[in-house]
């Protein structure tokens, strides 16, 4: 499982010009799921992301978690994170999870993130063509890969 985390001041996702999810301060999470991903991978990421201290404290140091600032999440499914670009110029997405499997794991990830963090989790729509807009904060961008824990 791969997740790209971006610290944001605000973000929203639209489908067919309709806003389906929006947040103020928090994280945008781009979530890529592989067929080998498990519930253990989900919980590893949920704990790491919820407890990650990348928000500034009163002295300007990255010392606060999203829970400390009572932020929110915008979670977006993104199979293209699993692109293989080793051969040729066209990416291969054979490493991405089967859509039925991936949709279930993505929903489980979002549910566990809500339960563990106690914070709101806005989402896009799995498999949809989405427009995501955001205002980066920092910028702070961190890549998580459960195959490299």
Swiss-Prot record:
InterPro entries: Daa-tRNA_deacyls_DTD, DTD-like_sf. One of its GO terms (molecular function) is tRNA binding. The keyword Oxidoreductase does not apply. One of its GO terms (cellular component) is cytoplasm. GO terms for biological process: D-amino acid catabolic process. Its EC number is 3.1.1.96. CDD domains: Dtyr_deacylase. It is found in: Cytoplasm. It holds the Pfam family Tyr_Deacylase. It catalyses: glycyl-tRNA(Ala) + H2O = tRNA(Ala) + glycine + H(+); a D-aminoacyl-tRNA + H2O = a tRNA + a D-alpha-amino acid + H(+). A motif (Gly-cisPro motif, important for rejection of L-amino acids) lies at residues 138-139. It is an enzyme of class 3 (hydrolase). Keywords: Cytoplasm, Hydrolase, RNA-binding, tRNA-binding. It comes from the Bacteria. PANTHER family: D-AMINOACYL-TRNA DEACYLASE 1, D-TYROSYL-TRNA TYR DEACYLASE. Homodimer. An aminoacyl-tRNA editing enzyme that deacylates mischarged D-aminoacyl-tRNAs. Also deacylates mischarged glycyl-tRNA(Ala), protecting cells against glycine mischarging by AlaRS. Acts via tRNA-based rather than protein-based catalysis; rejects L-amino acids rather than detecting D-amino acids in the active site. By recycling D-aminoacyl-tRNA to D-amino acids and free tRNA molecules, this enzyme counteracts the toxicity associated with the formation of D-aminoacyl-tRNA entities in vivo and helps enforce protein L-homochirality. A Gly-cisPro motif from one monomer fits into the active site of the other monomer to allow specific chiral rejection of L-amino acids. Belongs to the DTD family. This is D-aminoacyl-tRNA deacylase. It comes from Leuconostoc citreum (strain KM20). The gene is dtd.
